[in-house]
Amino acid sequence: MKISQIIKTVIAGTLISTSTITYSLYHSEKAKAEVDHYYRDGFQYPTYVTALNKAKKISNKNLSISHYTTTKQSKLKAIGRVSNKNGWKKGSNDPKVRKQDSMGTGTVIGSHTFITNAHVIDDRYGKAAAAKYISFDMNRDGKSVPYHFHASKVIKVPQSDIAVVHTKENMGKHVKPIRIATDKEIKSLKFNSTIYSLGYPWQHNDNTKAYFNRLRFVQFSGNGSEILTKDIFRSGASGSPMLDSKFSKIYGLRTYGYNLDGKSTDQY
């Protein structure tokens, strides 16, 4: 499939259509939020206030995050760690940080295509990094890297924090892509509905291991462009998919939120 066709498919698949229901994160009011140049409708008033009040009605016992080691035997195999060797860390004053990759999570949606957040593949100036700097370790768990793919084309979807990445290798030989949910399926989400995800969050001083999350739907943002959830979300999980219980369709991408470093006095 050509890149232009992929983008049209993504748009038609509701990640960025006029009736878009796309991405987002929701957390406790006690911690700081990620700051970047992308517009976050979930942070706008009064959406933030109403979502917070609703989130307080959802018990923290309904949320979970745990190391996941069985992706080789499941549909979650299509998810992996995205590495950006020319990301925001290149602008750090700390030499050790400059040597690190900027990273996030991606999901295979086509034989040669995965999707992630645009801020994951951005350079320090907010532009898409060249394809040669982007790679995808599908199904990675720590030092176990069964599949390593190289980007051939990186496309940022206009007016959204979404990127479509084309790969040199045919990932479809190794995994079945996960489809993007329809508008109708996304709009069927109700308050406190369970959503599932797998990503590569910063946990125990490491961002190379896969973690499985259970999160809860709170509401759609004011302009209908974002899914607000109550979640245990950490840096590195950006771009991870919001999935149904069968892991068969993507409602959106986990993108931003509070307590990204997990150091808030609030548990989540």
Please name every model-derived segment:
Residues 130-217:
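Serine endopeptidase catalytic core focused on the charge-relay Asp
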Residues 1-29:
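Sec-dependent N-terminal signal peptides of Gram-positive bacterial secreted proteins and lipoproteins
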